[in-house]
């Protein structure tokens, strides 16, 4: 009898254990999948209540992101001597990613990916960077961009729930220079102004043809977007006219505005995406960091129909999706994008390499590293320093998946090889802006690719990339 009771006891324990394992597996599966792919359309909470609730939560959300940035990076304003962007803004210099206590970059580079993972030594600044409020996401703009658009158009891109997170000195210069492949003789055609719906005509009438002028008008015209629209499901204090392409891609470059990619579910697996420049799209054959769209026309249409609304056509219908006409509007917009040129690089020859008569010894040494020991040219091939392919760096070799401010840090997957021409004008770096300086970028790829570069070689490599 006692033996029977003991057997029943063990059977009960076994059943409970199996149930716990089943529930845990089910929860894990749910965390990986999400409950639904769709966003909530029928908002029943009054807008005043939404705004009050999210505004009250804003300080704590901002503090959490600020604390994370300070934990990951040295955010001091330390401009490089003699190194500027096209219109004179100083580049930030130095490695800003903080190392784990007790190690050095050389010691870290000597370890295998498995050793770095098992000893938890992967630098926090190399992990994917979360959105300032990852569960909410959405477009978020630097304050200088908000101020200028509000000044010119009276249109306010301020979000009541969130502010931009990265300091201004790590962002591209504003307004950016604007160069045209069709009129290289004119140099910067922006006249030092931010191109908007209020001034595009006076700036470009007589320089662009009528088709291009209409394309530019569409690029600076705001259309409804997920956070910026006229419904109660918005993140602006008053109904918004929306967002224009050039609100993020200012003057055809970038202002560093951030968003979440719309092609991933659930929310915690979505990647932060930093706005990429439109310069040089004429030589590119892939568009979108991971989507591999094949033409500028495809991407232009995709932005309006999908990216503006987190990849959800249901909610896009509610908020006022702008369906572009492919045969005219899309082509007009694409033609303008395809004549946006890279900035001048006076030290490069016709093949995209350094002219020895113009380059410094450090730049020439850096070029040798770029094409040799550093393995950079395996993907970034001249003259524009892209192979127009996608590559998976398999960064997950170096760390165990972890939740960071409600973002699940896992593998990045295959990412487009972005051109390096004019790279000094477009910080921060990587698709999510996790690397603040070129020095950070060199340390990242030295570790990921196992280059084992010396300190001097790293400095020379930075000097070369500044000349591109």
Regions found by a protein language model. Give the residues of each.
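Short linear interaction motif-like sites in intrinsically disordered regions of transcription factors
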Residues: 9-11, 106
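Bacterial N-terminal signal peptides
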Residues: 12-22
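Periplasmic c-type cytochrome electron-transfer domains
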Residues: 26-468
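N-terminal secretory signal peptides that target proteins for export/translocation
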Residues: 1-7
């Amino acid at each position: 009898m006692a033996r029977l009771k003991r057997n029943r006891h063990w059977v009960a324990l076994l059943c409970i254990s199996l149930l716990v394992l089943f529930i845990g597996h089910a929860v894990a599966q749910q965390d990986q999948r999400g409950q639904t792919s769709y966003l909530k359309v029928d908002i029943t909470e009054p807008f005043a209540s939404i705004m009050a609730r999210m505004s009250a939560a804003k300080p704590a959300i901002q503090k959490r992101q600020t604390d994370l940035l300070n934990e990951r990076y040295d955010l001091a304003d330390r401009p490089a001597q003699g190194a500027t962007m096209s219109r004179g803004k100083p580049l930030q210099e130095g490695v800003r990613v903080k190392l784990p206590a007790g190690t050095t970059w050389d010691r870290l580079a000597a370890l295998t990916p498995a050793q770095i993972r098992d000893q938890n030594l992967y630098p926090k600044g190399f992990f994917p960077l979360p959105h300032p409020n990852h569960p909410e996401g959405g477009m978020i703009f630097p304050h200088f961009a908000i101020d200028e658009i509000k000044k010119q158009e009276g249109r306010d891109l301020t979000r009541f729930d969130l502010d931009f997170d990265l300091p201004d000195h790590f962002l591209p210069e504003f307004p950016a220079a604007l160069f045209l492949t069709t009129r290289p003789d004119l140099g910067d055609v922006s006249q030092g102004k931010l191109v908007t719906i209020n001034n595009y005509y006076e700036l470009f009438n007589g320089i662009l043809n009528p088709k291009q002028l209409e394309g530019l008008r569409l690029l600076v015209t705001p259309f409804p977007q997920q956070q910026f629209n006229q419904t109660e499901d918005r993140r602006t204090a008053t109904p918004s006219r929306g967002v224009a392409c050039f609100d993020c891609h200012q003057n055809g470059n970038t202002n560093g505005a951030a968003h979440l990619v719309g092609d991933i579910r659930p929310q915690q697996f979505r990647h932060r995406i930093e706005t990429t420049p439109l310069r040089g799209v004429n030589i590119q054959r892939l568009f979108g960091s991971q989507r591999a769209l094949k033409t500028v026309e495809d991407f232009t249409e995709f932005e309006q129909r999908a990216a503006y609304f987190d990849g959800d056509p249901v909610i896009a219908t509610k908020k006022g999706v702008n369906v572009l006409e492919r045969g005219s509007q899309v082509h007009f917009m694409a033609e303008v994008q395809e004549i946006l040129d890279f900035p001048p690089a006076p030290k490069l020859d016709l093949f995209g390499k350094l002219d020895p008569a113009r380059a410094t010894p450090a730049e020439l040494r850096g070029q040798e590293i770029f094409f040799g020991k550093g393995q950079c040219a395996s993907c970034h091939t001249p003259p524009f320093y892209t192979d127009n392919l996608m590559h998976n760096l398999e960064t997950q070799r170096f760390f165990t998946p972890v939740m960071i401010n409600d973002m699940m840090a896992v593998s990045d997957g295959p990412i487009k090889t972005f051109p390096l021409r004019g790279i000094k004008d477009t910080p921060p770096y990587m698709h999510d802006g996790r690397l603040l300086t070129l020095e950070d970028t060199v340390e990242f790829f030295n570790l990921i690719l196992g280059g084992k570069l010396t300190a001097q070689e790293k400095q020379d490599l930075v000097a070369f990339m500044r000349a591109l």
